[in-house]
């Protein structure tokens, strides 16, 4: 039995702080791969792997501002470093206000799925110019392995829409969906992806219109879909709300509260389903942000409790044990 200490700075097997904020866990061939943001000294997407969700081995900076680029479409912008001669406007208060001589862009909330047809690992993320949140784009990258160097294919507005906080979801039949905050965060959009997962093919649903939701997390339990998310309040935590549906493209239940009024001082990052269990166990992972000290933010992982197929909740525990 292994134990997690919530709300602390977790460290990898080399003793270094784990930087994987706004992240995602992919289970692949017996390993849990954890992807997330690293803004400690440079702006990277990091990858870690573990067999037990406790001991995390650092696998590298899998996407950086120096990553290989390969265009997929003339509509995709390959920029990973800002042009020093271009005016990007006023710095947004949520963008880190510190010296950035390398003019890096922001790659936020990276999520990765495996495409069995193309045999590629496909990353989607939220892209911004590093100064403010005016671009509101999605970004795509691919790799032949889960922890190798991803090739960057560019940023874009899916089907012409704004796209900020985001997540990915892969259904049982292999169909993939990209979910993101759109229309200045007022609405939540669900897009069905192309078979290769490299583009948004159709906007299949608009959820919570005018509700200003962000940090979306979508998962499936049995035959029912669930979505978690927070309200837009900057670095300040707020009440997590959830909804559920029998159809990802159909009608969803009204939003309902879960956890407490600050979601235990976290914002949703992802939900991971534990493999090989007689009864499915779903774990909520939240980032406990440190505001301007973004790089020292910590993590909270909690088991989700289900009551029937339309209700869920999770309670806080300082220590959480996992038996894998």
Regions found by a protein language model. Give the residues of each.
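Carbohydrate-active catalytic/glycan-binding domains of CAZyme proteins
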Residues: 1-324
């Amino acid at each position: 039995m292994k134990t997690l200490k919530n709300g602390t700075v977790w460290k990898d097997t080399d003793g270094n702080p784990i930087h994987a904020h706004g992240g995602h866990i992919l289970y692949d061939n017996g390993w849990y791969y954890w992807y997330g943001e690293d803004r400690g000294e440079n702006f990277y997407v990091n990858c870690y792997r573990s067999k037990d969700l406790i001991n995390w081995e650092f696998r590298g900076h899998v996407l950086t501002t120096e990553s290989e680029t390969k265009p997929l479409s003339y509509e995709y912008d390959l920029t990973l470093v800002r042009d020093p001669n271009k005016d990007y406007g006023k710095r947004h208060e949520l963008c880190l206000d510190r010296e950035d001589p390398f003019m890096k862009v922001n790659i936020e909330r990276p999520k990765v799925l495996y495409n069995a047809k193309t045999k590629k690992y496909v990353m989607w993320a939220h892209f911004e110019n590093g100064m403010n949140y005016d671009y509101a784009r999605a970004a795509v990258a691919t790799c032949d392995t889960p922890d190798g160097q991803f090739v960057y294919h560019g940023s874009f507005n899916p089907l012409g829409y704004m796209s900020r906080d985001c997540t990915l979801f892969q259904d049982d039949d292999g169909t993939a969906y990209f979910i993101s905050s759109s229309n200045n965060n007022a609405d939540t959009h669900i897009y069905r992806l192309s078979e290769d997962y490299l583009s948004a093919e159709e906007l299949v649903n608009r959820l919570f219109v005018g509700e200003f939701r962000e940090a979306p997390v979508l998962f499936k339990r049995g035959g029912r879909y669930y979505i978690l998310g927070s309200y837009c309040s900057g670095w300040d935590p707020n009440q997590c709300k959830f909804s559920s549906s029998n159809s990802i493209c159909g009608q969803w239940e009204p939003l309902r509260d879960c956890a407490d009024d600050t979601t235990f001082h976290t914002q949703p990052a992802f939900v991971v389903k534990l493999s090989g269990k007689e009864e499915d166990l779903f774990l909520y992972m939240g980032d406990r942000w440190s505001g301007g000290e973004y790089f020292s933010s910590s993590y909270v992982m909690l088991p989700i409790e289900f009551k029937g197929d339309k209700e869920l909740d999770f309670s806080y525990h300082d220590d959480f044990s996992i038996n894998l």
